[in-house]
Amino acid sequence: NNNTDLPWHICSIIDDTSDVNLLNTRVLGELERGASSFELPSFSKNPKRVLNKVDLSIAPIYLRNLKCNENEIKDFVNFLLEWRKINKKDPCAGIDVDPIATDIWNNYFSNSNNNSKDRLKDLISLKENSQNNLINVNFFHFDGSLWNDLGASLIDEISLLASSLIELLRIYKNNNKLKVSFCYSLGTDFFSNIAKVRASRLVLTNLMNHFEVDLDITHIGRTSSSLFYKESPWINQLRVTNAGLSGAIAGVDRLVCHPLTSKLGQAPEFVRRLTRNTHIILQEESHIGKIQDPSGGSFYLEKLTEDIAREAWKRIKEIEENKGITNLIQNKKFLNHLEKNRNNEIDKISSGQIKRVGVNTYQDPNPREIKVKPYE
C-alpha cells in the first residue's frame, strides 16, 4: 500500500461529478492538502483526464462503486495496466467492492440491477490475468461496513468477514502472499471499535495458520453510516472524530472518514478540510501512530478483544458447519435476523432508548445550516 511514512493512509472520498475537470481538481486538491490516498465512487468517465497529474505509485486509488458491473471493474484494471506501461511504475490501487456483501446491500438500499452471483470468480479471473503486472493492486476486499448497514452485530461482522475469506481460499488455491483487505465499521462505541479490529486480527491469524497461507492483509476503518444524521451535522463531526480515534488506536492501515454532511449532499470545501484535518491532528499532534499497539496492556481491552474473538470463532464454526457463507446469505432466517437488528436500532433511537446527541437529546435550539450541493 506504499504506506511507509504514515501511521495509516488518509483516504479521502471524492464526490462524483459529471465534470471530469472538476473531478480531477477535487482529486488533486485532496492529495495536495493532506490526503495520501483517495476513493472514487465510479470509473465510467474519462480516467486519463480525471487522474491527470496523479502519481498512482505513491497515491493509491480505490474504486468503491457498489453499483458497478463487471465491465467497469475491467475498465479500471485495464486503465491500471495502461498507466503502468506508460509511466514505467507500479500503480497502487484496490477494488473496494465486496464480492459477497455488495449484492445483498444493493437488494436493500439501492435499485441497482448489476448484481452478480459470479462476482468472486470474476475477480479471481481478473487477478490471474494480470497478477504479474499489477503487484500493488488488491483485488479482494471484504467490507464489514456493508454488513453493519444491513444490521450485523459486532460478532456477526467479524464472522462474516472471516467466512468470506474462507470462501475465497476455498475457491482460489494460488493464494500465497495474496493481497486481501478487510474493512470494519467504526461506530459510536469507542472501546468496541478498538476491540473489534484487534479481535479480527486474532481470528484472521488463526485462519491463515489453519489454511497454511501467508496473506498480505490490509485493515481498513470506515466511519459507520449510523454516525450521521441530517438533524445534527455539526455533532456528526464529534462522532467522526471519536470513531476515527478508535480506528487509529486499533492500528488500521487505512482510515476512511465520511464528511459530516454525508447525509445532506456533497461536502463543501471547508467540510472536506475539516475531515482531512481530523486525520492530520490525530497523526501529527496525538502521535498515536508512533506506538505499535496503543491499547496493548489495557486489561479491559485485552479481555474484551479475547471475548469477542472467541465468540466470533464459535460463529464462524457454525457458518462453516452449514456449508459456508454462500449458503448462509441465501437463508431467509439469516436475512430476517439482520433486518430485525436494523429495525430494532432504528426503533430504539426513535423512542429515545438509544441516545444520540443532537438527534433525540440535547438538540441544538439554533442549528446553523450548512449549504451543500445535492449528489449527482
Model-inferred region functions:
Residues N1-F190, F211, D216-I220, R254, ...:
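Catalytic alpha/beta active-site cores
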Residues N1-L23, V27, L31, R239-A243, ...:
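Non-catalytic terminal/interface segments that mediate subunit docking, oligomerization
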Residues G34, K85, L204, A250, ...:
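Conserved, mostly hydrophobic/aromatic
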Residues N136-E167, L245-R315:
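Mobile "lid/hinge" segments at catalytic clefts and subdomain interfaces of large enzymes
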Residues A152-I158, T188-A199, S225-L238, G265-T275, ...:
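Short glycine/threonine-rich loop-to-helix capping motif typified by GTGT followed
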Residues S181-T188, S192, K196, D214-L227, ...:
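Catalytic alpha/beta core domains of metabolic enzymes, predominantly
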Residues S200-V203, L207, T241, N277-T278:
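Extended, hydrophobic alpha-helical segments in both membrane/secreted and soluble proteins
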Residues R273-E376:
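Catalytic-core signal marking the mid-to-C-terminal active-site face
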